[in-house]
Amino acid sequence: MKFGFIAHPTSVGLKRYVKMIDLLQRNSTELHSGYKRDLWRRENLVPFMNFAKITSATGATCEGVIKYMPLVADEMLADARGIANRVVSGIEELVEDGAELVGLGGFTSIVGRRGEATAEKSPVPVTSGNSLTTYAGYKALMQIQSWLDIQPEQEPVAIVGYPGSICLALSRLLLAQGFSLHLLHRAGHKDEDELLSHLPEQYRSRVTLTSDPEDLYPRCKLFVAATSAGGVIDPYKLQPGSVFIDVALPRDINSDTRPDRDDILIIDGGCVTATDAVKLGGESLNVTIKQQLNGCMAETIVLALENRRENFSLGRYLALDNVLEIGELAEKHGFLVYPLASYGERIDRQRVINLKRYYHHDIYSDEPDTEQPPASQLAFIDAIIAQDPAREDTLDRYHQFINPMMVEFLKLQHCDNVFRRASGTQLFTADGEAFLDMVAGYGCINLGHNPQPIIDALKAYLDAQGPNFIQYISIPEQAAKLAEVLCHFAPGNMGRVFFSNSGTEAVEAAMKLAKASTGKAGIAYLKNSYHGKTLGALSITGREKHRRHFKPLLASMIEVPFADIEALRQTLSRDDIGALMIEPIQGEGGVHVPPPGYLRTVQEICRQTDTLLMVDEVQTGLGRTGKLFACEWEGIEPDVLMLSKSLSGGVMPIGATLCRAIFGNGPYGTADRFLMHSSTFGGGNIAAVVALSALREILAQDLVGNAERLGTYFKQALTDVAARYPFVAEIAGRGLMLGIQFDQTFAGAVGASAREFATRLPGDWHTTWKFLPDPVQAHLKAAMERMEQSLGEMFCMKFVTKLCQDHNILTFITANSSTVIRIQPPLTISKAEIDRFVSAFATVCDELSTFLE
């Protein structure tokens, strides 16, 4: 059976989209067949999509055609009689195309007395689609009610658009479930008895009528809307926790884009999604229109699949039996109300559950109490602390309160793990599944997770009730010990230490020290470097993607090309440059190791130009590369040295900025200046106790030697695997700081795709391209190149995904390069664990080796 469907754009933007499709379609036909006057004539309907064959989940089939009437709602209402005639003409066009049933979308049914007048003139049966639209809205609300764990008698529901056919049917369904309703009608409906007459008498006591939306905002948090006018409800007046199911089109929320509120949820109601078992015509690359189909169109498809050539869903009164029947038939054929969506984007159960606190005030309370925390507040925090959350609970809590994009990114990569326990090189989920950690907190966890000697030292200090944050009213004993140990082991003649809480703070301290001790504003840094994301550290980070959104950054910071000695010499010879910030290995830059002798030459130039040499060992320091400090590989003696990450074995935040005593005494050696740089938490005894224990264990367990021995073995084993696969460009790094550089190039792929389509599609699209304006061509070419780059990054991320999903191994990319996977395991890693990684890496390489160049 073949159906037809008459849609219409629901906004000016969609009308212009249809206009674009129409222009391109006619132009394509002209390019293929030549100019014909009839091709460029006024049309009643615009062709949009042909479904050559639709196969449902049951195996039933039908075919259909969708055409647009290129008018928005206001244009239709301005000439309702004329549009009604155009709808009938459109039906006749579809019948000529073989349609045996025609669906009327949105206003194309409203202008014909909700389809009744249209049906009288139509040569074939018609449907408004309102029954399945109603069913979808109803099921969405029932699911929301279940997820929020509320009973019908607890929360009233606002119905916006009563007594329209959808709202009337919804009202009757909800009243039968026990809900109380607030019905919003047009201001012109004054006769309340007449309005109530549409509802069964036994339910009318649970109904409140109003024509003013303002009445709804303080009374209701659950809304279902289906007006013909649209734009009725102000989303910024909704109560926190409100769920607004916007059934059908036009939108009844007065916003074309998602409102900037996290405490409400607006759901695209009245839609269904086809399951994988449904085939809507030819499908290629899993690309087809199957999600969030309007209920009116889906109802037409379902009736065609059932071979039901009958009028359906006509008039104001939709038979509830029909509503429930078409819903069940839709589900049978594979058209489901779930997943739900908001402005086209999927939403899941937890997104709704996050709103429960606005409904269950016995558990969640915001009542203030100035004297003492009320019992409800204590109950809330006690419940949070005691909770044994499911993985999804944690993901959604993080999504709601910390970083939603991070959660969505990890979900996209299938790496959205939540770990409960950690030991050594392993991380464990709540159900005990173990993962090998090859990231180790980006180099923090040198001693492995929860190293017992450090835990014992920390417990002993706490059990002895040792003091912690006393550094500005007394002299902290443990911090003093740690400073001496660091100065003893660090290369060069270090004599001063400033403690902080992180690597970026250590860098900030070094920058201030450089300015104060040299009297010069400028600091040089290397291209592709990474020193942190606070404003100062970002100003000397050589990667534009981290910087662009925070400009202007600090002035007088000068970038120098990596490994370019002459450029460095010229820069450091400038009068305004007082210091150079450098990493012995660019970790986040993609694990770039400088050429042999480069660092030694850098030191010589710094000495010749009287430039402060500041070495950032936040990631490379304390054994990671096979030396206690990576700069020792070339005998470098910095003027300033920065440490963090593994300084505490990853157990506690700590950073340290070391310098020669002469540089520390100068800017901070007077009565007015000795407290010019300070940190509330920096230099606390507890962090120092942990750091002292960590340094001891690095030496006691010979982790520096372990990093060198196993790192050499590891790098060679990976290199042997990589030699078989040209998409692995290099195994870079030193010790147990390695990077796998991928080069699966897609250069030219998008351009070739465009040319292929231009060649295969009807017409001469190559000529069309030639006459696009130069700026348009330039932007399209830039977009194609960036897309090709993104495909290479996507390929790299598939390694991260497959190592995680298939082998329970955790890896990640570097901050500056999305085509480099970092390998920075705990220095306690065993040879067997390295072999496990190499084997898994080889397997993934083989599985992703369909294309070799």
From Swiss-Prot:
Its EC number is 2.6.1.-. Its cofactor is pyridoxal 5'-phosphate. The modification N6-(pyridoxal phosphate)lysine is found at residue 645. InterPro entries: Aminotrans_3, Aminotrans_3_PPA_site, Class-III_PLP-dep_AT, NAD(P)-bd_dom_sf, PyrdxlP-dep_Trfase, PyrdxlP-dep_Trfase_major, PyrdxlP-dep_Trfase_small. GO terms for molecular function: identical protein binding; pyridoxal binding; pyridoxal phosphate binding; transaminase activity. Keywords: Aminotransferase, Antibiotic biosynthesis, Pyridoxal phosphate, Transferase. It is an enzyme of class 2 (transferase). Disruption phenotype: Cells lacking this gene show a white phenotype and produce 4-hydroxy-2,2'-bipyrrole-5-carbaldehyde (HBC), 4- methoxy-2,2'-bipyrrole-5-carbaldehyde (MBC) and 4-hydroxy-2,2'-bipyrrole-5-methanol (HBM). GO terms for biological process: antibiotic biosynthetic process. SUPFAM superfamilies: NAD(P)-binding Rossmann-fold domains, PLP-dependent transferases. Homodimer. Involved in the biosynthesis of 2-methyl-3-n-amyl-pyrrole (MAP), one of the terminal products involved in the biosynthesis of the red antibiotic prodigiosin (Pig). Catalyzes the transamination to the aldehyde group of 3-acetyloctanal, resulting in an aminoketone, which spontaneously cyclizes to yield the dihydro form of MAP (H2MAP). This is Aminotransferase PigE. The gene is pigE.
